[in-house]
Curated annotation (Swiss-Prot):
The keyword Mitochondrion applies. One of its GO terms (cellular component) is mitochondrial outer membrane. It is a peripheral membrane protein. GO terms for biological process: aerobic respiration; mitochondrial fission. This is Mitochondrial fission regulator 1-like-B. Mitochondrial protein required for adaptation of miochondrial dynamics to metabolic changes. Regulates mitochondrial morphology at steady state and mediates AMPK-dependent stress-induced mitochondrial fragmentation via the control of OPA1 levels. Coiled coil: none annotated.
């Protein structure tokens, strides 16, 4: 009985205040009457404190410390990557960038609901300069292309100058051929004969009393084009028509000498060369060549009027 009483003592301390509340009295057992007792927990009869609940009792023996919070660091700009000697600390942006890589499929999750590849554009915060030590080849290619541009432009300008020289020579041949064919008459030269074939046939058989010189002109001559007037054009046409009438009668005295310069500047040089053509004619002295340098505006007007007036010799006679 002593052992049973000792074992019942801790049970009484846990579930009740007194032994009478926890179990029946020995007198009741002897009399055969069972008496029900109400079991009251210890934590209901205790005041507020550390032993009020089982959770607080466990928490007092096993204290739970708060977990450490995640620290986010700002990413440095690409310009400051080489200025700092300390290594960069990896952040969540690195993980996002790795998950966005197409080759590294192991970093993806099944719940990844990222949009399509051609629509997805990573934000500047997610884009990491992982290969910052690798040189940027695109920038070098652009720099080399910019350095090659002047050389390409020079080559193009030289090609354009060659084409302009060919055009200049063709224009000079056309003007010279028209003047030769109109001066010698329609009976002496057929209409369908090539211009290049007519020049060597009729050129050396006459004395050189007229010369057309094509040369380069400076930029100062361009300003003279705006000063051209209609009155000078009319006067030049009348004087040319009178000279052409005497030219038709004296066929033995006519000749033509064409010379070209070797260097040509640009497209405006075509007009400059025509302006600078030197027309020297002195019908009073037949065997002498007197070179006259006239205004470029008057020269081009005279050459054009000579071209169109010589084509119609009948109109020249009627006008006089």
């Amino acid at each position: 009985m002593a052992s049973l009483g000792a074992a019942a003592e801790p049970e009484r301390s846990l579930f009740g205040k007194d032994g009478a509340e926890a179990c029946e009295s020995p007198e009741g057992r002897r009399s055969g009457r069972r008496k029900r007792t109400k079991i009251v927990p210890v934590w209901e009869n205790k005041p507020c404190g550390s032993s009020r609940s089982l959770v607080r009792r466990i928490g007092s023996h096993l204290p739970l410390k708060p977990c450490t919070r995640a620290c986010f660091e700002a990413l440095p700009s690409p310009a400051n990557l080489y200025l700092t000697d300390t290594p960069m600390v990896p952040t969540l942006a690195d993980i996002k960038w790795i998950a966005a890589d197409d080759d590294e499929t192991y970093a993806r999750v099944r719940s990844d609901t990222r949009p399509l590849k051609h629509k997805w554009r990573p934000s500047p915060l997610l884009v990491m300069h992982r290969n910052s030590s690798v040189p940027n080849l695109k920038m070098k290619e652009e720099k080399m292309f910019c350095l090659k541009k002047p050389g390409l432009s020079l080559n193009k300008s030289s090609d354009i100058q060659e084409e302009l020289s060919i055009l200049r020579s063709q224009i000079a041949r056309i003007v010279a051929g028209d003047s030769v064919s109109s001066c010698l008459g329609s009976d002496s030269i057929p209409v369908n004969v090539d211009l290049e074939a007519t020049l060597p046939d009729y050129g050396p058989s006459y004395q050189s009393t007229t010369s057309f010189v094509i040369s380069d002109i400076t930029e100062e001559d361009e300003l003279d084009v705006s000063e051209y007037s209609s009155a000078s054009l009319v006067d030049s046409t009348i004087s040319l028509q009178r000279q052409l009438e005497t030219n038709m009668s004296d066929d033995d005295e006519d000749s033509l000498c064409l010379s070209k310069s070797n260097s040509f500047a640009d497209m405006m040089g075509i007009l400059k060369d025509i302006h600078k053509m030197k027309l020297n004619r002195d019908w009073s002295n037949r065997n002498q060549c007197l070179h006259k340098e006239e205004d470029p505006v008057n020269l081009i007007s005279e050459v054009l009027k000579q071209k169109f007036a010589l084509c119609d010799p009948d109109n020249v006679k009627t006008n006089d």
